[in-house]
Amino acid sequence: MSLRIGVVTPMDNAMDAVAEAFADIWSEAEVITLLDESLYADYGGGKGVTDETYERMAVLLQYSQDSGADGILFCGSVFGRVVEAVRVDISVPVLSAQEAMIEEAFAAGSRFGVLTTVSGSLQCLLDDIERYSQENNKPYTLVQHVEDAARPIILAGDVETHDQMVADAADRMTECDCLMLGQFSMTSAVKRFADISGRPVLTAPHTAVRKLKRLLAG
């Protein structure tokens, strides 16, 4: 019997990236998706992260577990701390959006490139990188860029133009041991990236699926 993975996402444009990652890495897994767009709607509407956010996250993760999930992946990049706080009450492995990517980045070296299309996502990722560095006594340097003009384009449905803008920005970030893409919705752009020797590109969905497979399937 295949293992069931619950994917909880606040944006529907993350679903294709997650499906691609599972197809590439762990096609035998059964993936069940739970979408709650209200999380980002409220976060972007000026509320930020509130007590209600934690309560709703607890409900979502518990629902996914109750639906038979053997492991859970949450896709929203700005809710990492919320996921980490709530998952202590969940009995199956739960990954926040970025943690596996950060672990792989530090395994690859100490010079990081970080590319996002939303400043809020960038800051959350930078905070998580710094926290990992402090907790594991691993120094690092990084270059960062927000390709903010690409965000409204993908929200309008123009994935092709969005992906080309992300690829153009990525191809300028060469002086690093790895390049991290800060949002699930950026994953489709990777196929357009130039092949730069010695600079692997890390995406949140692919690194997360690799870690879940390692934890659950060996």
Question: Which functions belong to the PLM regions below?
Answer:
Residues M1-G218:
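Non-catalytic structural scaffold of enzyme domains
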